[in-house]
Amino acid sequence: MNNISFKLFITISIVLIIIRLFFISNTILIDDEAYYAMYAKHLDWGYIDHGPVVAFLIKIFSYPFLTSFNVRIGAVICSIILAISLFFFGKKYFNTETGISLSLLLSANLLFHTNSTILTPD
């Protein structure tokens, strides 16, 4: 693998992250996200239909202001962590090109892109 393809990989990844950030800053919360944001205001170890992880993520990233961007930024950060993890997994067990392919195939997938900007466990 040459340096140019790695720079292209980084550039494409950054562009996809910027698109996600633009998307979450220009859309309103869906009903479930508003429901989980209410959970974040009243944290508990469990709720009637879900565990506390989504509420904890929203609480962490929405301090001190509870906005739609802050509610969804946790989903974007988790998707970035997943893409980086896939890159290192592919690099460790196969080669660098496989790591790049895994990460880009995940990040560029339209269904993943849409679902990685909505913070719900469903």
Q: Which residue stretches match the model-derived regions?
A:
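Hydrophobic/aromatic residues in alpha-helical transmembrane segments
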Residues: 53, 85-86, 101
